[in-house]
Amino acid sequence: MTTKTVKLLVFLTLLVHGIGHLQGVVSGLGVKFNENSKTQSWLLKGSSERVNRIACLALYLGAALFGIMAALSFRAFLLPHHIWQTFAFISAIFSTFCLVLFPDALAMFFNKIGAIAVNLLIFYSIPFNGMFPSAAFND
């Protein structure tokens, strides 16, 4: 695989990961994707529906924004290139909290599996593997 192909795959993965979390934002706004879609967190059961929806909205919005910013930063579009890993890591943290606290806010089970896979890739690649191997991105 060429360097350009790897860069394109990383960019698209980060972008789709960020955009995918907008489903949770829509759920936080009260739109139901299906009969199982809900914004009630198992941790916030004693709180009102409004508090749950605001928490869902805020967490998924954070994951979406940081995911999109990571993708844009990776391509050095509007944001500096050197901070893309920080944005990706923050997005993965927000995403993990979203998936743990509000597992039914995403439209389909496939969306959850995809988000978990990208989060695991980010958690492995960035802090535990000494950042992404720079050799993969050399031109």
Residue positions per predicted region:
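Membrane-interface extramembranous regions
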Residues: 2-139
